Regions:
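C-terminal interaction-tip segments
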Residues: 1-38, 47-50, 88, 126-156
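Extended extracellular/luminal ectodomain segments enriched in beta-structured repeat modules
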Residues: 49-57
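Beta-strand elements of well-folded, non-transmembrane domains
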Residues: 62-64, 85, 153-155
């Protein structure tokens, strides 16, 4: 059997959905299968390009809900990530749990001199055309706080 001996590289950067925020908790019934409705607890983070995509890392940062100032104490939570086959995510068989990122409790203020440490999941994953990645939170962030999920990758 002949193998592909020529490495392939992504053609176009794909940084996922801009301003992907999760701030409230998913319902217990949806928290393990990725079937939540898209909203403040569950958000689309990435869509693969027409020829598929490669993802290098997923980062979770402390942020604020749109139009708000980041100030207060974040609750500790887990951000769960699901790979969806491009079909309706509210059908459990269309989703696969991709990974989890633990985010510790953190007090933030907008003009603080303290650096908030992002949580990074190095993943190196090739995904088929049209597949999506969704992110959801297991615990509400609190107040006007939210976690921003960003994905670094590219389209083939």
């Amino acid at each position: 059997m002949v193998a592909n001996t020529t490495p392939i590289f992504t053609l176009t950067p794909n940084t996922g959905e801009m301003n992907c925020l999760v701030s409230t908790a998913m319902a217990a019934a949806d928290a393990m299968d990725g079937t939540s409705s898209v909203g403040t607890a569950f958000a689309l983070a990435f869509t693969a390009g027409a020829d598929g995509s490669r993802i290098d890392e997923i980062t979770v940062r402390y942020a604020a809900t749109n139009g708000s100032t980041a100030s207060g104490t974040f609750a500790a939570s887990v951000i769960r990530l699901w790979l969806n086959n491009g079909s309706d995510n509210t059908t459990a068989t269309n989703n696969q749990l991709l990974g989890e990122i633990a985010v510790p409790a953190q007090t933030v203020t907008a003009l603080s001199t303290q650096i908030t440490q992002p949580q990074v999941l190095p993943i190196e994953l090739n995904i088929p055309a049209g597949y999506r990645i969704y992110a959801g939170s297991t615990v509400a962030a609190g107040g006007s706080l939210a976690w921003q999920v960003s994905i670094a990758g590219g389209d083939y």
